[in-house]
Amino acid sequence: MKKLALLGALALSVLSLPTFAADKPVRIGIEAAYPPFSLKTPDGQLAGFDVDIGNALCEEMKVQCKWVEQEFDGLIPALKVRKIDAILSSMTITDERKRSVDFTNKYYNTPARFVMKEGASLNDPKADLKGKKAGVLRGSTADRYASAELTPAGVEVVRYNSQQEANMDLVAGRLDAVVADSVNLEDGFLKTDAGKGYAFVGPQLTDAKYFGEGVGIAVRKGDSELAGKFNAAIDALRANGKYKQIQDKYFSFDVYGSN
C-alpha cells in the first residue's frame, strides 16, 4: 500500500509540474487567421497584435518562446495533452473554459458585433435573423452565444474553422450575417476591399455569460507559476509603455478596456 501510495504521489507530482523553466522554450498556441490579432504575412511569418504582445511578454519574462499554429477549436485540447504550454490567441476568459484551463489576467477586452450588408436592420437579432444564416468561428464566444441564443430562435448557425472563411461566405451570399469580435471584424474585414458594402448592425454584445471577462492567456490547470509570470509581464508592459506602443500600432483606442 505504501508503495502504491508513493507511486501515486509521484505520478501526481509529475502531472502538476510547472511549465515555466528558463532553459526550455514556452510553446504558445495560436490560430493565425484572426486579423489584426493574428495573421500570416506574404512571406509566411506570424504577425498581429497577439504575436507582438506575446513576443514582448516573453522578452519581459526573459524566456524563449515558440509559436505553434493550431485551429482555434483545437487549442485547448492541445494544451491539455501538453503539445503546447499556453494559448495566446484572442481567447476570451469564460466560466466554461475555466473548467478546463486556467487563465492569466486579461490583456485586452472588446465587444462582439454583427456585420451584415449596409442598410440592413438588426434591432432584435433573434427575431430579425429568424430563418436566416449567421456565421461564427467554431469554438469561439460568438459560437457559444449563437448556440444558446440564436439557434433556439430559429437562426441557422454555421460554424467555420477561421473567421476569414465566415467573412468570405458572407460576401458570397451564403450567409446573412457574421458575429465576432468587433475589432477583428473592423480591421480584418470592414476595412478591406472585401468588406465594402458591409457594416456593423445591431447592439454591442457584452454579456459576460457568453463573452466573458476579457481576453487572457490560457495555461494548464494548476500551472500557477507560468500564469504568474505572464501576469507580472503584462503588468510590466502596461507600466513601461510597451503595451501602448504595440496597441497604437494596430488601434486608435484603448483596446485594454476599463480596469
From Swiss-Prot:
It is found in: Periplasm. Keywords: Amino-acid transport, Periplasm, Signal, Transport. SUPFAM superfamilies: Periplasmic binding protein-like II. The keyword Transport applies. Residues 1-21 form the signal peptide. The keyword Nucleotidyltransferase does not apply. InterPro entries: Lys_Arg_Orn-bd (IPR005768), SBP_3_CS (IPR018313), Solute-binding_3/MltF_N (IPR001638). Binds L-arginine with high affinity. Shows no measurable affinity for L-ornithine. This is L-arginine-binding protein. It comes from Pseudomonas aeruginosa (strain ATCC 15692 / DSM 22644 / CIP 104116 / JCM 14847 / LMG 12228 / 1C / PRS 101 / PAO1). The lineage of its organism: Bacteria, Pseudomonadati, Pseudomonadota, Gammaproteobacteria, Pseudomonadales.
